Amino acid sequence: MRLFYRLLKQPVPKQIERYSRFSPSPLSIKQFLDFGRDNACEKTSYMFLRKELPVRLANTMREVNLLPDNLLNRPSVGLVQSWYMQSFLELLEYENKSPEDPRVLDNFLNVLINIRNRHNDVVPTMAQGVIEYKEKFGFDPFISSNIQYFLDRFYTNRISFRMLINQHTLLFGGDTNPAHPKHIGSIDPTCNVADVVKDAYETAKMLCEQYYLVAPELEVEEFNAKAPNKPIQVVYVPSHLFHMLFELFKNSMRATVELHEDKKEGYPAVKTLVTLGKEDLSIKISDLGGGVPLRKIDRLFNYMYSTAPRPSLEPTRAAPLAGFGYGLPISRLYARYFQGDLKLYSMEGVGTDAVIYLKALSSESFERLPVFNKSAWRHYKTTPEADDWSNPSSEPRDASKYKAKQDKIKSNRTF
């Protein structure tokens, strides 16, 4: 423990600096699948992870130190840093240990499980730090931009880190889910999209009914351009897709119920369209919940703009549909992680269409990973420049006063 605290106090421990010089190695869903299905070898996985996991940790740990000091000094942020440092040091112990020793493989597996459990609360803990910072120091556009940039990369790194750990522990830990025997780790080779849609809807519906006592119905339509009249399937991580869909259904239900609660005709259904083309698998969720003004769309994905109240520390007092306001930005990161995206199209006064885009081919679904390099460093160090587009002032200029002022200047020059 003395070594741990000594390293934590150093500006940049040498091992972190060394590993951060390497770029992460992005894998495709097909590579995950092929390894787990055809030639799953625990020794090979161990040899890869004992290098790759420290590289991914080191890249994000170097970037953390570029955040404003006032944010780094928040207790919650310090706690997250300590978790990352501890996990990094535990992984370093296996840097040179031979995979031929079965005890090494068993111990490494247990270390990965402990690390995963330790990092379970990284998102809410870091969110707490951002809230503490915002409450004490207010909102600054430049710092907010840097925090947005960092958190997108930080949380993406966390998604990828857990993906690697989950694949190893599920393949070699003997904790395969009997309900999904065909899964390769956390990947479903034949993920039925409509089934995940319905599961996410039912979970969101349960919460909506628990809080509002009612919930809109669901209408699902499929259009398979590759194989007409057949169910749409994709090689994907069902838990990732569920996370995105649940968040979107939750938002649609809340908006729909609150807008139509006093209307006699009831609640309009939430409609879902699933389509599969040559390149993209798209899922559109449409509601009639009143929509959002265009100027607010970007704010829905901004960590610093969240209008959600600070969540209660007592679970019994927390509203089921409340949180840190991170649901949409994190969901978009899940979509982008394997080269997809999540977009919102809203018509104020009517409703919102939320579209999830995924790659149709697993060979094109490569991890999208943040890399710590000079470009990333410059993003934090570059000072904001003047806007090169006009900005409307808060009050329109009175042309008559301006003209009178110019006439007075001219008359003074005459004398």
From Swiss-Prot:
Residues 383-415 are annotated as: Disordered. Residues 395-415 have a biased composition (Basic and acidic residues). PROSITE patterns: HIS_KIN (PS50109). Coiled coil: none annotated. It comes from the Eukaryota. GO terms for cellular component: mitochondrial matrix; mitochondrion; nucleolus. One of its GO terms (biological process) is hypoxia-inducible factor-1alpha signaling pathway. Keywords: ATP-binding, Kinase, Mitochondrion, Nucleotide-binding, Transferase, Transit peptide. The modification N6-succinyllysine is found at residue 278. One of its GO terms (molecular function) is protein serine/threonine kinase activity. Gene3D superfamilies: Alpha-ketoacid/pyruvate dehydrogenase kinase, N-terminal domain, Histidine kinase-like ATPase, C-terminal domain. Residues 131-362 form the Histidine kinase domain. It is found in: Mitochondrion matrix. InterPro entries: AK/P_DHK_N_sf, BCDHK/PDK_N, BCKD/PDK, HATPase_C_sf, His_kinase_dom. SUPFAM superfamilies: alpha-ketoacid dehydrogenase kinase, N-terminal domain, ATPase domain of HSP90 chaperone/DNA topoisomerase II/histidine kinase. It catalyses: L-seryl-[pyruvate dehydrogenase E1 alpha subunit] + ATP = O-phospho-L-seryl-[pyruvate dehydrogenase E1 alpha subunit] + ADP + H(+). It is an enzyme of class 2 (transferase). Its main location: mitochondrion. The keyword RNA-binding does not apply. Its EC number is 2.7.11.2. Inhibits pyruvate dehydrogenase activity by phosphorylation of the E1 subunit PDHA1, and thereby regulates glucose metabolism and aerobic respiration. Can also phosphorylate PDHA2. Decreases glucose utilization and increases fat metabolism in response to prolonged fasting, and as adaptation to a high-fat diet. Plays a role in glucose homeostasis and in maintaining normal blood glucose levels in function of nutrient levels and under starvation. Plays a role in the generation of reactive oxygen species. Homodimer. Interacts with the pyruvate dehydrogenase complex subunit DLAT, and is part of the multimeric pyruvate dehydrogenase complex that contains multiple copies of pyruvate dehydrogenase (E1), dihydrolipoamide acetyltransferase (DLAT, E2) and lipoamide dehydrogenase (DLD, E3). Belongs to the PDK/BCKDK protein kinase family. This is [Pyruvate dehydrogenase (acetyl-transferring)] kinase isozyme 3, mitochondrial. The gene is Pdk3.
